[in-house]
């Protein structure tokens, strides 16, 4: 039986295709035990203000943990979450809108601080929940790489092979960046099929899914994403 997997680092409120690939796969592995990357999307994302201007929404990182793996990185002790919450809601014009979603997001940031990885993972799981509206049949199996493979790998593609083997997956779903930065021959030698999903529609690769929810509403975003997911599953089957 063919099983597809999407393997990705835990980004902070990432863009919609991140979730499209998750929901189009049988398994999602959160790559949380690789090195944190400064100035990446591990601790920041982009939103647009009421005038359509882009701005960074960042969680400030404790400098002492910046060189560690993602699951060891923490946010600054003096980070004022409530102040940031009000600032973001004012900039985006959502101070009196999307109260349930805003409350849930900031509650997760508060509850799982100071660990960046834990915050990101819980936010990803929350977004998956509201997109699927609790429909468990749509959701993939979710694993953390730190729980199923504790070895530190010098070769990142061999790491993927081991994760695929540990979850009994024989097909890996990749976006353009992953496809170009891995040794595809190693995957093929280990009989792992590769699906390049570079059909990112009209989504801006920098903009958070939260921005789309603010602009179009969760029902419209959910409908759009699930429609693409259904197309993807057919597309993936043909590519396996």
Segments (PLM) and residue ranges:
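Residues lining hydrophobic/aromatic ligand-binding pockets adjacent to catalytic sites
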Residues: 1-240
């Amino acid at each position: 039986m063919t099983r597809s997997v999407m393997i990705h680092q835990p980004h902070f409120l990432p863009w919609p295709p991140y979730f499209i690939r998750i929901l189009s796969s049988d398994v999602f592995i959160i790559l949380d035990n690789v090195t944190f990357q400064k100035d990446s999307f591990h601790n920041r994302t982009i939103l647009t203000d009421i005038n359509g201007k882009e701005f960074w929404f960042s969680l400030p990182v404790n400098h002492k943990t910046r060189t560690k793996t993602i699951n060891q990185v923490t946010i600054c002790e003096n980070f004022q979450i409530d102040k940031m919450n009000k600032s973001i809601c004012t900039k985006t014009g959502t101070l009196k809108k999307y109260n349930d979603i805003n409350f849930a997001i900031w509650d997760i940031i508060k509850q799982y601080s100071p660990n960046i990885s834990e915050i990101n993972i819980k936010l990803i799981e929350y977004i998956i929940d509201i997109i699927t509206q609790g429909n468990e049949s749509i959701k993939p199996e979710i694993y953390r790489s730190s729980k199923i493979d504790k070895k530190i790998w010098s070769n990142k593609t061999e790491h993927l092979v081991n994760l695929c083997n540990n979850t009994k997956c024989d097909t890996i779903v990749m976006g353009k960046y992953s496809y170009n930065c891995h040794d595809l021959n190693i995957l093929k030698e280990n009989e792992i099929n590769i699906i390049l999903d570079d059909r990112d529609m009209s989504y801006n690769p920098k903009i958070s899914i939260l921005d789309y929810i603010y602009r179009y509403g969760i029902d419209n975003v959910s409908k759009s994403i699930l429609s693409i997911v259904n197309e993807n599953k057919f597309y993936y089957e043909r590519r396996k």
